[in-house]
Amino acid sequence: MTEKATAPGEGANDLSMAVLNAIQNPVILVDENGFVAFANWEAESFFGASANHLARHDISAFIPFGSPLLTLIEQVRERRAAVNEYRVDLSSPRLGADKLVDLYVAPVLSQPGSVVIVFQERSMADKIDRQLTHRAAARSVTGLASMLAHEIKNPLSGIRGAAQLLETSVNDEDRSLTRLICDETDRIVSLVDRMEVFSDERPVDRLPLNIHAVLDHVKAIAKAGFARRIKISEHYDPSLPPVFANRDQLVQVFLNLIKNAAEAIGDRADGEILLTTAYRPGIRLSVAGTREKISLPLEFCVHDNGPGVPPDLLPHLFDPFITTKTNGSGLGLALVAKIIGGHGGIVECDSQHSRTTFRVLMPASKGLAADEETPMTKGTNG
């Protein structure tokens, strides 16, 4: 039997490809004609196309018309020197909205005209900035809620009492007006009560939790009530380590997210909600002013096939009083952001037509195996 000979350099090429595929950033090689000569696995995911498909097209087919990336490529070819460009907008129907990236473009000296491009998505850093904005907004609601509880609820109780007294002495035609006064005061009191949740800054007990037990419990509540006609399925990572959190608050978070998904789906017959969990070890956040990095490897998602969130609303979705619901208060998602932020995590939303995903990223609990039960989770199956 004759063994296949290895061509000179073939082993080195295989090693180079293995190294490039191990990089967690999208990397592509563009040849002298502008065609994609190589794309690593992350680039396939980034562009939503296979390496073979990418290789049959000019790079301009995959980025927005007039993108500054094309200018950078020409600049690197002319100067034969690498450049860095920050916060380049590659937003497009193909790549999605809010696609900000940092770019590193370098010449391949052994192949004149060819350049290698490394993409570093800015989305995570920008999401952290938005989370800080959400927390500041929640703090402003906290102060407002404390003031409203004292300055508004007390007078409202007097107004409602007076309306009830009037109701006993007016004719039937005017009784509807006194009833309206009572109903509206009740509505305002209910709104203030919901806002008072923001002013509760008491420390909460946290324990290592099995997130799947929490999600199953929330699913059972949803199927018994508002989501009884909607298919809810799950795709869990069984090896997920525990999350260090307060169980009641996590139930509140995911009950809110699943209810939002159910309301978005409405009465459509093919409505479906998908719950997923995953371990993403590559997500690490820098802490301002220190060398510390926080790892947020636990990813919990609520997906739905509703109509999607309006693009103009998406950047403000977690701000207080933002809602598309006729009778909504706009406080549910703001509370979700406050709770998750208080646990050291972040929450984000990605929405396109017929597909919306709410993604919660949280730190893992230290010192417990993934399958170890805790007092908070033992025996909890929803």
UniProtKB/Swiss-Prot annotation:
Alphabetical keyword list: ATP-binding, Cytoplasm, Hydrolase, Kinase, Nitrogen fixation, Nucleotide-binding, Phosphoprotein, Transferase, Two-component regulatory system
Source species, domain of life: Bacteria
GO annotation, biological process: nitrogen fixation; regulation of DNA-templated transcription
Subcellular location: Cytoplasm
Molecular functions (GO terms): ATP binding; hydrolase activity; phosphorelay sensor kinase activity
Family matches, as SUPFAM superfamilies: ATPase domain of HSP90 chaperone/DNA topoisomerase II/histidine kinase, Homodimeric domain of signal transducing histidine kinase, PYP-like sensor domain (PAS domain)
Post-translational modification: Autophosphorylated.
All residue ranges annotated as the Histidine kinase domain in the record: 147-366
Catalysed reactions, as listed in the record: ATP + protein L-histidine = ADP + protein N-phospho-L-histidine
Domain (PAS): residue spans on this chain: 14-81
PTM-bearing positions, type Phosphohistidine: H150
Primary location: cytoplasm
EC annotation from Swiss-Prot or TrEMBL: 2.7.13.3, 3.1.3.-
Listed InterPro entries: HATPase_C_sf (IPR036890), His_kinase_dom (IPR005467), HisK_dim/P_dom (IPR003661), HisK_dim/P_sf (IPR036097), PAS-like_dom_sf (IPR035965), PAS_fold (IPR013767), Sig_transdc_His_kin-like_C (IPR004358)
Gene Ontology CC, one term: cytoplasm
Pfam family, one: HisKA
Function: Member of the two-component regulatory system NtrB/NtrC, which controls expression of the nitrogen-regulated (ntr) genes in response to nitrogen limitation. Under conditions of nitrogen limitation, NtrB autophosphorylates and transfers the phosphoryl group to NtrC. In the presence of nitrogen, acts as a phosphatase that dephosphorylates and inactivates NtrC.
Protein name, as recorded: Sensory histidine kinase/phosphatase NtrB
Biological source species: Rhizobium meliloti (strain 1021) (Ensifer meliloti)
Source lineage: Bacteria, Pseudomonadati, Pseudomonadota, Alphaproteobacteria, Hyphomicrobiales
Encoding gene (name): ntrB
